[in-house]
């Protein structure tokens, strides 16, 4: 099983300069071979790697950076062409220095006189990571580095718009997935905008609406940016301030979702949610911003991953299942809930008073139970 660990890098001046050189060289190699492919046609990655050796003489500055990062840049281009040929994406584009700055390098192992060496290594005791050409770099990101055990595959170094540097390390670990156990509890969850998650037990997790909280601050900074001279130092400073606000929104949202998911998975063996069509829902311009801010897909993906690791069950009911229209007691359907302002309604058949969201989550739970019995 592959796991990714992300750390913040604390660089000295020489390391920072070398990272920016590597960004530029990796981008140069990518654009050089993309331009050649456009002129003469698609070239295989192996042939491009052979030609790369000749570029060192023509462009001596390429010798200053990690050679593995340049080969990885070639394989990234090859992946872009593979996606294009498979019609998963458009034709590869040239990279510029104003877009995301990153490069990837592979872990290379060797043995000398019975001692194993590796160009990428994590030193848990000192909170440091060894990277090619950069040497030892201080890191921060995990409280317990001792929990990281496995074989390092590669590392991706990136610079965020906020000016911070990060490394993402891919580690191959022994797959420790708990065997499926006999479930003793089940919960259905309904996803919403006002309350982010509503469970069939009646518990509601509020939506902090991180974007709405900082919207005024973003508007003020974006207005300030529009009045500044593009390319000036003040323009760059304001762009960083805007990026930091977006980073705070993203981190706060993710932290809240992690806490909600952990609480739900911890106390339930079967979890059932909706399979929402977020793209279609976002066409409602009155709710689009709130729906995107809620990050429904992140919740579902995290639930799927957590339940798999812990040997529990996760199901999604059909997108068009009428969970809000159906009475959870007698199964009678109604059209009164087509109006989103109706939060509570009384069933005409059995007289049961239904809370819109709790009723939907109960129906989702029952539907998930049917799916569970069909699959076991």
Describe the function of each predicted region.
Residues 1-376:
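Nucleic-acid substrate recognition interfaces
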């Amino acid at each position: 099983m592959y796991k990714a660990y992300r750390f913040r890098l604390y660089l000295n001046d020489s390391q920072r300069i070398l990272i920016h050189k590597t960004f530029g060289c990796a981008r140069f190699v990518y654009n050089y071979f993309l331009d050649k492919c456009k002129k003469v046609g698609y070239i295989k990655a192996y042939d491009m790697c052979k030609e790369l050796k000749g570029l060192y003489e023509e462009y001596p500055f390429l010798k200053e950076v990690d050679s593995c990062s340049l080969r990885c840049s070639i394989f990234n281009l090859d992946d872009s062409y593979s996606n294009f040929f498979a019609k998963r994406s458009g034709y590869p584009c040239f990279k510029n220095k104003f877009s995301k700055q990153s490069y990837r390098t592979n872990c290379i192992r060797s043995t000398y006189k019975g001692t194993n060496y590796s160009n990428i290594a994590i030193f848990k005791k000192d909170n440091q990571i060894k990277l090619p050409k950069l040497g030892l770099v201080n890191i921060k990101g995990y409280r317990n580095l001792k929990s990281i055990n496995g074989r390092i595959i590669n590392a991706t170094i990136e610079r965020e718009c906020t000016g911070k540097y990060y490394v993402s390390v891919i580690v191959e670990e022994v797959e420790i997935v708990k065997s499926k156990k006999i479930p003793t509890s089940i919960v259905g969850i309904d996803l919403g905008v006002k309350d982010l998650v509503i469970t069939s037990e009646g518990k509601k997790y509020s939506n902090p609406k991180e974007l709405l909280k900082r919207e005024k601050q973003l508007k003020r900074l974006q207005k300030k940016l529009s009045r500044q001279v593009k390319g000036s130092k003040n323009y760059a400073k304001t762009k960083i301030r805007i990026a930091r606000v977006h980073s705070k929104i993203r981190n706060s949202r993710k932290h809240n979702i992690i806490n909600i998911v952990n609480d739900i998975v911890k106390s339930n063996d079967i979890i059932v949610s909706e399979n929402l069509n977020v793209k279609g829902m976002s066409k409602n311009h009155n709710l689009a911003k709130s729906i995107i801010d809620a990050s429904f897909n992140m919740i579902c993906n995290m639930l799927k991953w957590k339940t798999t690791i812990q040997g529990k069950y996760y199901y999604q009911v059909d997108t068009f299942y009428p969970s809000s229209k159906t009475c959870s007691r007698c199964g009678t359907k109604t059209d009164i809930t087509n109006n989103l302002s109706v939060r509570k309604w009384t069933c005409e058949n059995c007289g049961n008073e239904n809370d819109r969201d709790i009723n939907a989550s109960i129906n989702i739970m029952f539907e998930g139970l049917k799916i569970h019995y069909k699959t076991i």
